[in-house]
Amino acid sequence: MVKTGISLDSVKNNNKSQILKILQKNGAMSRKDIANQIGLTPAAVTMLCNDMMEAHMILEKGEMKEQKRAGRKKVLVDINYDFKYIVSVNIEAVDTSITVTNIRGNVLVEAKVHTRTDIEPQLFLEELAKEIKLQLWEKELKLSDILGIGICVPGIVDRNNGISIHAYGIWDNQVKIREILEKQIQCPVILENNVKAFAEAEMLYGVGKYGNNIVFIKWGPGVGSAIVVDNKLYEGNQHNAAEIGHYIIEPDGLKCRCGRHGCLETRVSMFALCDRIKEIYSKENTPVLYEETAGDKNLITRELLTSWVENEGNGYITRMDQTISEILVGAIERMARVAVNVLTILAPDCTIVFGSMFENTSIYKLFIQYCTKYDENYTDKLISRSHLRDKMAYIGGTALIASTYLSLIHISEP
């Protein structure tokens, strides 16, 4: 006889997940207020909360402060954000960051290693696994304390199978990241594109949880984007969606690291900007930079450009050569033009921008000015900087695991 219908355990898990999500969005609440929101009886919610308290998933936070009233005071419950911990790994072209956080995203451990592209991906990932285990050991954390490992990489990702299909600027071929790391660490791994992971973090921890349709744009070191439709990340054909950095702006233009020609990234990424600056670099064209770098164009690197952008108000950027200023302004205009075209088609509720280039207030303001020039509706009210941008190195990886946990979806054991 074939059993049909929904199991009682499934219903209970679904209700527990609803409770966790409400607490994540609203903070500590009373059992009665939770019951009113999810449509269950206070008695049913009390039973569910008792189960979760026994499992250390939630905890009581004391009595609610309210006006004097007869009867028992409401007792608040909240998520136990220190119930377990999460390892977040962000693999970029130059460096890879390793961060251990609690479920809320508060940091316990931070470390950084060089992203080695001079060796086979498997060897680098094995080295990475050793570093992760070292960081856990130094913090006296056991694998049983870890909910999972969230991995973020640029480029095209097959999340379901844990495969990096093409990590632009890092690996040209497919890399089975989840399989390799789970074998080394014996801990569940979730892999996602870095911009999509950040979008997931915004929906969990940031202003994204208040909007239904959102576009995310990242600038620095490359260009990336993600789309949220009806509170869900949009996944396109072949795991490839919303690649604004590979919007073609110049037919027969420069070859991009994605393999095509004329992509936006070939003109506005930090690598492209460095190449363009090197082309015009001379004592006559760039006298200030020439002096800063002692006549050595090899010192013009992505790291140098990043330091200019991040140290706004200090150093070279305050007295930049006019020729280099024109290159940066041209890049900002291109970014704004493509962004307006994309937003005109998608018409989102809001747009959230982040990345090292948008960290610079002058660059962000000029970007908004160009957007408004092309369409007066695209002001800083519609296009805003992420409040999570200072957590960009780890919050995406944390969100991958935390959102799965809050949904009470079982993370497959390796």
Annotated model-derived regions:
Residues 89, 147-152, 156-275, 402-408, ...:
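Phosphate-binding/catalytic loop of phosphoryl-transfer enzymes
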Residues 1-61, 67-71, 76-137, 141-144, ...:
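ATP-binding/phosphotransfer module of carbohydrate and carboxylate kinases, centering on a glycine-rich
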